[in-house]
Every structure is written in structure tokens, then in C-alpha cells.
Amino acid sequence: MAPVRRILLKLSGEALMGPDSFGYHAGTMAGFVGQIRDVVALGVQVGIVVGGGNLFRGATGALAGMNRATADSMGMLATVMNALALKDALQQAGVAARVQTAVHIAHVGEGFERDAAVRELEAGRVVIFGGGTGNPFFTTDTAAALRAAEIDADLLLKATKVDGVYTADPNKDPDARRYDTLSFDEAIAKQLGVLDTAAFALCREQKLSLVVFNVFKPGALKRVVMGEDEGTRVSNH
């Protein structure tokens, strides 16, 4: 089966720290970069939205008494730091990459511009979108759905630590069962919590298929883009 043309990969900040409790884990980063390099080699155009939870979470700051808008702005800056770290790791591995930020930050990355992003993707460069949506109160999951729709991605891929969507937390419930496929309506109605409601709704409205998979499994990203049985696919059916 031929790979998809263009994907948007949502990579959490927590994933970047691997087994550590903060920052970046070199071995984990190298593993992600290797998987991304493999799909780029297939001719797949790759956009990435990265979270910031390994450095700062806006919701956590708000719980500590910060103004939520201020805390979310700090969280958005954390995602830009992660975008730069990921770009550097990709470039050191020989993968051309660019950073676009939701708000313009001079000398750090280009401000997001849809046509420019598509040109970079078509030229074979990985485009990493930092800064979330550029607005407080929106998660990076929503940013991923938004950017996926804007760049006309064929698939939105949510990279997680589990190999799909389950009926319950598989770490707590031994009877939890993995879904092979789901509709967005089912996922929202059952409050499965894989994405926030705004992100789910945007995917549903834009008819954007989502695959939830375990990015820590070697080769999982390549199997997803090749259409193999990996993770859980969520769509409008």
C-alpha cells in the first residue's frame, strides 16, 4: 500500500522527556527523529505540532494561582522551545526542517503562514508548528487539528504512550479493550478523552481522519502512514 501524501503529527512535550521528569531525553528524541526520517524518505510530507508539557503547562500554572491567559502564554513559549529542539535534532540527522510559530518571534522562527508552510512541505521539508493556536485557553491538540485542516493533511496522528484508544485505562483495567476504529461521534459521546472536545469537533467538521498510536513502538509511525494495522483510527465512518 502506498503511503499517505501529507500528515500532521501531534507530539506531546511529555513524550520528549522520555523516562525523565523534565526537559529532553536524548535517546527518546533520537528514536522519534529516526521514525520521522523514515517516513520523509517515503516521500510523505510531514507537519508537526509539539506540546510543551515537558517544560511548562499553562493549566498547571493556573492551578498555582497564575492568571490563566498568562500561564497559557508561557505554555505556548514552551512549545516554541520544543519546536526549536526538534528542528535541531532533525537537522543533525540530515532532515531539512523549518519552524513556524503561531505568533511571530523574530530570529526564532517564521510566523505561521499557510501558503508558505505548504510550499515547505512540498519541497520535502518537515514543518514544525510552535506556539499552539496563538491564543490562551486552547490546547495543543486543538492546534494540531487546526494546522492539519489548514495544510490539508490526509491524516492527523496523535502520538501517545499507548497503542490506541481503549474502553478504559489499560494501565488500571485489565479488561480494557482497544478499539480498531471509532467514529468522532462515539469518541465524543463516550468521553474517551483522547483529544479535547474542540479538537474532535474540528476533525469531524473537516472530515479529517485521526490515528492514535504508540510512538514509542519502533517503526509505528511508518506503519501508520503505510495504512497497516497500527493504533486506532477515528473518522466520520
Swiss-Prot record:
Reactions catalysed, as given in the entry: UMP + ATP = UDP + ADP
Gene3D superfamilies with a match to the protein in the record: Acetylglutamate kinase-like
Signal sequence extent: none
GO cellular component terms given for this protein: cytosol
GO BP annotations, alphabetical order: 'de novo' CTP biosynthetic process; UDP biosynthetic process
Domain of life: Bacteria
Subcellular location, principal: cytoplasm
CDD domains for this protein: AAK_UMPK-PyrH-Ec
Enzyme nomenclature, EC number: 2.7.4.22
Annotated binding of ATP, by residue: K10, L11, S12, G13, G53, R57, T160, Y166, D169
UniProt: UMP binding residues: G52, D72, T133, G134, N135, P136, F137, F138, T139, T140
Pathway info: Pyrimidine metabolism; CTP biosynthesis via de novo pathway; UDP from UMP (UMPK route): step 1/1
Subcellular location, record wording: Cytoplasm
Role description: Catalyzes the reversible phosphorylation of UMP to UDP.
Similarity-based family: Belongs to the UMP kinase family.
Oligomer status and interactors: Homohexamer.
The name this protein goes by in its record: Uridylate kinase
